[in-house]
Amino acid sequence: MHLVVDIGNTDIVCGFYTSEGWQVHLRTPTHQPWTAIRLEHWIQKELTEKGFENIVVESVLISSVVPPVLIQIQKGLTF
């Protein structure tokens, strides 16, 4: 599965993609006190609630217009 992250001024959107298409989308406000651990826990919680557990992420693509948030997101997306 591939993870695509868009860090915008309003929201952070995470999409999980396979050869069969988009599997799940997650959305949260950008301007929160994001830390790497908090991001990791949020993604795990959201995926579990949507029925996606123990997924294997093969690659990550990040797009960002908010550099301070990008640093924490990169730390949190270390697989």
PLM features: what roles do these ranges have?
Residues 1-23:
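Gly/Thr-rich phosphate-binding beta-strand-loop-beta motif of the actin/hexokinase/Hsp70
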Residues 18, 45, 75:
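Short, well-ordered alpha-helices that flank and scaffold nucleotide-derived cofactor binding pockets
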Residues 26-28:
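Short hydrophobic alpha-helix segments
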Residues 30-32:
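A short acidic/small-residue loop/turn micro-motif
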Residues 36-50:
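Glycine-rich, highly charged phosphate/nucleotide-binding loops
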Residues 50-79:
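Short beta-strand-loop/turn "lid" adjacent to the catalytic site in phosphate-handling enzymes
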